[in-house]
């Protein structure tokens, strides 16, 4: 093979590599799993949905999501048979994608009322949903809630399943004074995976800012 032919072959191979579709279209598939059980009153539900919309509108979060083509979905959960994928998987390829998703998140209507708290069942549904996510390098489930279980299966089986799938489970615990067993402790001990973390909002009013910091940590892959 002549030098010119060799250069041509290398150039064609390089061009093909650059033009080939990436195996992972996105960096992170992030499923937001929101507690809407009986302990969440209507005003607290509004705080959660509005807080999610505000977090997604944060300029730093928006820049990372577009640059990394993050895939988002929202699941709401309560009792053992009560889980609903409210917003299906959406790849954030441009700012308009995120703006539309944030608007839809803020307008979500509550699917369940007067129901129990079953995070173990919620995790099972979340894992089923994340199996249908676009191909991404990382898959993360972000569980938020203000109570410990009062029904449904233990979360341990779902946590083992998540670790086998390579899915990270993180938690956002909403706690109020006098709420009994700290939700943060339950999330740390029973819910999150070994590579996961928990952040705590000390009231529902602190939810939006805590969620913003949590999502930023998840998509920026900040360690510690």
PLM regions and their residue ranges:
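Von Willebrand factor
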Residues: 26-88, 91-92, 99-144, 170-183, ...
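Exposed acidic/Ser/Thr-rich ligand/metal-binding surfaces
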Residues: 114-165, 216, 220, 224
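Extracytoplasmic/secreted envelope proteins and their assembly/folding machinery
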Residues: 45-53, 57, 69-71, 87, ...
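VWA/integrin I-like adhesion module and closely mimicked acidic/polar interface patches used
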Residues: 148-189
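Bacterial N-terminal signal peptides that target proteins for export
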Residues: 1-11
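C-terminal "exit" segments of structured domains
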Residues: 199-224
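N-terminal signal peptide c-region/cleavage motif recognized by signal peptidases
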Residues: 20-21
